[in-house]
């Protein structure tokens, strides 16, 4: 077995974000405002179930404990349940999560659970149905809310909800969000709006630092929790009067990258060392046969030697990320 993935800055990597499609049926203003547009034609299409099985097996041999399936919208894959099961085959992977817009959650969550899914993140940027429609381009607010209820009914102890923090859109709705999570085991994660190649104007108009919310939470008696090694980048806060939690993801904060523990593989098999990195390292030619696993592990480990210390977002560097559906956010 190869050694634990570690980069030149002594960061260890336990967490893989694996995109399985860049297709999405929502048109969120901060991601795909004009809807999904196919990229360059790729005869191989998106990663197959067997390719997913091989790449996650290689990462697990290198110490990966958590795999998050992302998109686009991953549940648009007809074989999504089989993909979950393929990852679940590997006992070294302790957590299998999905980030979803939630529109198929009510219908399919029990099947996903039975296939091996252990955690769910749902994107909800407003608790007002009309504003939700305006942000996403889809009139599916109640369907998504029913999906979250279905996840709890299916036995998920906690559901994470991702909310992109936007000035003059939802930043003033903190009290509404807090009332929603008070009786529910929801970890509500406010994510700072990030500048992408296609979203510079939106960023200038709507970016708000998560520190504004952080200061308000601390003022109200919320307590900062200690981060676990396979956790994502959120700073998590709890309060004795609330069943739910608040998470803040602030990529522009000083030292945000110091605790990076995650790598990304795109839906066409490229390894991305950073959400805002350049190019990517092609792994797909080593996902063809089971016998290539040692070579695949070696290429992943070698690529990690090139991971930079920080994303340089502060300098306005958005890398190749034209929109966040490209490599799964």
Curated annotation (Swiss-Prot):
Give GO terms for biological process: Mo-molybdopterin cofactor biosynthetic process
For [4Fe-4S] cluster 2, which residues are the binding ones? 257, 260, 274
Q: Note how many cofactor molecules are bound and how.
A: Binds 2 [4Fe-4S] clusters. Binds 1 [4Fe-4S] cluster coordinated with 3 cysteines and an exchangeable S-adenosyl-L-methionine and 1 [4Fe-4S] cluster coordinated with 3 cysteines and the GTP-derived substrate.
Q: Which SUPFAM superfamilies match?
A: Radical SAM enzymes (SSF102114)
What Pfam families does UniProt report for this protein, alphabetically? Fer4_12, Mob_synth_C, Radical_SAM
- Relate the assembly described in the record: Monomer and homodimer.
> Under which name does UniProt file this protein?
GTP 3',8-cyclase
